[in-house]
Amino acid sequence: MNFEGKLIGKDLKVAIVVSRFNDFITGRLLEGAKDTLIRHDVNEDNIDVAFVPGAFEIPLVAKKLASSGNYDAVITLGCVIRGATSHYDYVCNEVAKGVSKVNDQTNVPVIFGILTTESIEQAVERAGTKAGNKGAEAAVSAIEMANLLKSIKA
């Protein structure tokens, strides 16, 4: 038997956790995610957005939303750009671990849509210019994973 998640968003309820830090990037990621969800038939009323101060706070809020039982998927959006200190490495590692842990603990797909880039230019490219929109890609993954898990439970 093969299991595959369909890209049909009808009747799905999705939460998006988005960092306000680097909002000139995360705002574009959010637009891409919401637009993609709606284009895949997720009702706009079934999309909830939670804003957090920075990427480090994303896993906690994602866990709260995923644990609520109200959502078929949670999308995490943020942007961490390397600076002159090692802070970047700590934040990226902990956020990735945190999001992964939420997946394991809740059995709700929590999609990692957090940019970790070396420069502002790379972030801009991944937020809707040369390299597509990673928020839109995260939305597609959320729909697919939510439907995949539903098909396995059936």
Curated annotation (Swiss-Prot):
Which residues does the record give as 5-amino-6-(D-ribitylamino)uracil binding sites? F21, A55, F56, E57, C79, V80, I81, F112
Q: Which InterPro entries match?
A: LS, LS/RS, LS/RS_sf
Against Pfam families, the record matches this protein to: DMRL_synthase
**What chemistry does it catalyse, as a reaction equation?**
(2S)-2-hydroxy-3-oxobutyl phosphate + 5-amino-6-(D-ribitylamino)uracil = 6,7-dimethyl-8-(1-D-ribityl)lumazine + phosphate + 2 H2O + H(+)
Positions with a binding annotation for (2S)-2-hydroxy-3-oxobutyl phosphate: A84, T85, R126
* Residues spanning the signal sequence: none
The active site consists of: H87
Give the protein's biological function: Catalyzes the formation of 6,7-dimethyl-8-ribityllumazine by condensation of 5-amino-6-(D-ribitylamino)uracil with 3,4-dihydroxy-2-butanone 4-phosphate. This is the penultimate step in the biosynthesis of riboflavin.
**Name of this chain's protein:** 6,7-dimethyl-8-ribityllumazine synthase
Species: Staphylococcus aureus (strain NCTC 8325 / PS 47)
Name of the encoding gene: ribH
